[in-house]
Curated annotation (Swiss-Prot):
The keyword Transferase applies. Keywords: Calcium, Cytoplasm, Metal-binding, Pentose shunt, Repeat, Schiff base, Transferase. Ca(2+) 2 binds at residues 365, 367, 369, 371, 376. Residues 329-364, 365-388 form the EF-hand domain. Belongs to the transaldolase family. Type 1 subfamily. One of its GO terms (cellular component) is cytoplasm. GO terms for biological process: carbohydrate metabolic process; pentose-phosphate shunt. The active site is at residue 135. This is Transaldolase. NCBIfam families: PRK12309.1, talAB. PANTHER family: TRANSALDOLASE. The keyword Metal-binding applies.
Length: 390
């Protein structure tokens, strides 16, 4: 009998939400997505150290021996994203998503320039535009940047999408793909209402993606919908038929191990809802975001989390560059990661405190108890971690 993964793949493009090349080979998805948190997690795997070193050496050579470490690391971030992307494209038949620095999320011009640079690096490596999606946060500034890039033939994936206003603005901008975050929407509602769980059809994240999908298909928008950030199998199966679903290796394993029957829930040829079409300009976008506390909270939180992941990766790259060049290593990088995330200082990090991505949290949470201990973080990042107390 066909597995849940086989059945889902027959009606939806399954995308691997990971930077781990071995996990991608294992599940043979058609696309793959990356972000700074996933690259950070992959960078801890010894097998990929040569890719990191390649990027650092290339960046040093590009900007010169006299350049400060910070400049080399900044250049290497783009190189690393593209190097991992190139390796992923050797495995998946379609596309990889590579993310713009989240710290540029409110700067249209800087986002445009970064998108152009990333696609140029791919082009220089012989990768055509149609195999790459540039991931940009769904701020108004990010959406406007994507609109410009799309007109230049650079395809974009608008991420950190939580509100309907964001979705409509993205479609009107003609972006290639949007990534509404199912699980993070659920997290917010659980925290806000005090409910422990929601049945699949009542899951707020599922309802949000279903609404966006049906709206796009009803009014003929070409923008693809890729549900992301899943917490459980019910969320995934309730969105069977969505254009794409990007799924972590942990949940892909569960899908592959189940032979339960799957029915299609979303149908592009027969969308439901009949919602009135609207136009979203800057004023309406701001008004819709202001009226949607969940979308505002989660967008800001997501940008902050991805920004922190980039900063952590920068620390680790500086450490490695110092090792490669015979300099002094950064011995406190992992301690800084822990102290930064341990908001209440109780010696552990909960999922709510964690500023990075869910995929990294899951990878570090070795005993799957929903709490990261210093030992788990030490093992996960491969560095000594010493906590000091007042």
């Amino acid at each position: 009998m066909a597995t849940l993964l086989d059945q889902l793949s027959a009606m939806t493009v399954v995308v691997a939400d990971t930077g781990d090349l071995e996990a991608i080979r294992k599940f043979t998805p058609r696309d793959a997505t990356t972000n700074p948190s996933l690259i950070l997690a992959a960078a801890q795997i010894p097998a990929y150290q040569s890719l990191i070193d390649e990027a650092l050496r290339s960046s040093r050579k590009l900007i010169g021996d006299a350049a400060p470490v910070e400049d080399v690391v900044h250049e290497a971030l783009d190189e690393i994203s593209v190097i991992f992307g190139k390796e992923i494209l050797k495995i998946v038949p379609r596309r990889v998503s590579t993310e713009v620095d989240a710290r540029l999320s409110y700067d249209t011009d800087a986002t445009i320039e970064k998108g152009r640079k990333l696609i140029r690096l791919y082009n220089d490596a012989g990768i055509s535009n149609d195999r790459v999606l540039i991931k940009i946060a769904s701020t108004w500034e990010g959406i406007k940047a994507a609109e410009v890039l799309e007109k230049e033939g650079i395809h974009c994936n608008l991420t950190l999408l939580f509100g309907f206003g964001q979705a409509v603005a993205c479609a009107e901008a003609g972006v290639t793909l949007v990534s509404p975050f199912v699980g993070r929407i659920l997290d917010w509602y659980k925290a806000d209402t005090g409910r422990d769980s929601y049945p699949g059809p009542e899951d707020p994240g599922v309802i949000s993606v279903t609404r966006i999908f049906n709206y796009y298909k009803t009014y003929g928008y070409k923008t693809e919908v890729m549900g992301a950030s899943f917490r459980n199998l019910d969320e995934i199966t309730e969105l069977a038929g969505c254009d794409l679903l990007t799924i972590s290796p942990k949940l892909l394993d569960q899908l592959r191990e189940s032979d339960a029957s799957l029915s299609q829930k979303l149908d592009a040829t027969n969308p439901s809802g009949g919602e009135e079409q609207i136009h979203v300009d800057r004023e309406r976008f701001d008004a819709m975001m202001a009226a949607d506390r969940m979308a505002t909270d989660k967008l800001g939180e997501g940008i902050k989390g991805f920004s922190k992941a980039i900063e952590t990766l920068e620390h680790q790259l500086a450490h490695r560059l110092a090792e490669l060049e015979g300099g002094e290593a950064f011995r406190h990088a992992v301690q800084e990661i822990f102290m930064l995330n341990d908001m209440n200082g109780d010696g552990c990090i909960t999922r709510d405190e964690w500023l990075g991505s869910d995929a990294v949290f899951d990878a570090l949470d070795l005993d799957h108890d929903g709490r990261l201990t210093p030992e788990e973080v030490r093992k996960g990042f491969g560095a000594a971690l010493t906590l000091t107390t007042a």
